Amino acid sequence: MMSHRSSSEAPVIIVGAGMSGLSCAVHLQAAGLNLRLIDSSDGVGGRVRTDVADGFLLDRGFQVYLDAYPETGALLDLKALDLRKFEPGALVFNGKRLKRLMDVFRRPASAWTSATAPIGGFIDKLRVGLMRTQILGSTLEQIAKREDRTTESYLRGRGFSKAMIDTFFRSFYGGIFLESELRTSSRMFEFTFKMFGQGSATLPAKGMGEIPRQLAAKLPLDSITLNQKVVSVDPRSVTLSSGERIHGRAVVLATNSVVVGELLPELKSEMPEWRSVTNLYFYAPSSPLEEPIICLNGSGEGVVNNVCALTDASPDYSPDGRALISVSVLGLHPERDLHGKVQQELMGWFGECVEEWSHLRTDLISEALPEQAPSAKKDKAGFIQQNGIYVCGDHATSASIEGAVISGKRVAEAIIKMRLSAV
């Protein structure tokens, strides 16, 4: 129930207008609390942003929205986002050609093609089906309580062959986790597997940046302050780089873990490391695929991890019908001629049509995802409270849009509870 809002009531100050900060703000707004959302950048969204270059929509790194996310879906108007779905499966390059591996439960017509594809063995495909049944039959709460180990150890424990792990899981989940060693938490693997199994990987028709923009539209215009850097915090105020000090009833840090460590040095050692990715954009006269599907490098060679023609999912990513192609390379690769090397490599995948591709932009994303190893410290509350200051973000839950949204919600709930107990 929405409580009465007093215009004179001190606001909750939220530092960081990414997905976690926006989630916190929307829940506080719904409960009738005043808020002030401050971000150092020129727009909301944090890592979930979309730029425009020569009329093309360029997400900051290849990202998808999983429409099975329960908490995020409850906050969004998914119909208004006009979500465009990818095919449930992938094309895997085995060193010679692309082979189709689909979710046969959702694409039964592909059962024979997938079963006979030289990606793992037939027993591996049966094990995928068994794993799917078991994970989809588990609740998220049950998954969160399971023994945690690396994803590689988990997959080996389920009996998957080395060929299946190396050819499919390393490339597909390498693109999700931004690491191909599969050292990511098995709980995170099961969570992600469940979300893919229950729904679809999608893109908002107008870019991933539409997701945070929709959340920001729920807030009063005067509650959001952009292009202002916070340089110090305490439990009741923040100080901007301009010297201005803003007072509030509570302070929430919804920044990435690097900024958390700068503003709260006592937490720096507890913040996770970051995984990085290099994302290249090309435009072309036409798509090399002509279907909305992700292509994976299962060959174990080359630098490319995954490729996707975004315009096959949403033609709105292009201003004029040309194809927009996203290529992900794990890690940071600042070489000037990287795009040339990538095109040369992808000629082995798609043939001579790659010669017609034009390089549009390369993004070096050093802080793409927080580390998610089994040993990564996660607060059971989904957020951290340090010396009276609240800290939220996907680093405190799971490295995903859903994780960020949940963390922001839990901080909001804690602040609302504190306010009610003070009445």
Description of each model-found segment:
Residues H4-R5, P315-V423:
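Conserved flavin/dinucleotide-binding core of flavoenzymes
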Residues S7-S8, V231-G340, Q344, G348-F350:
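Mid-domain catalytic core of redox enzymes
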Residues A10-L37:
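N-terminal Rossmann-like FAD-binding beta1-loop-alpha1 element of flavoenzymes
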Residues Q29-A53:
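Glycine-rich FAD pyrophosphate-binding loop
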Residues V48-D67, G129-Q142:
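Glycine-rich active-site loop/strand segments that organize a redox cofactor
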Residues Q63-P70, I143-E147, R158, K194-A216, ...:
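Short beta-strand to alpha-helix junction loop
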Residues T72-G73, D77, D82-L182, G197-Q198:
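Mobile amphipathic helical/loop "lid" adjacent to a hydrophobic cofactor/ligand pocket
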Residues F189-S237, I246-R249:
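Helical element adjacent to the flavin cofactor pocket in flavoenzyme catalytic cores
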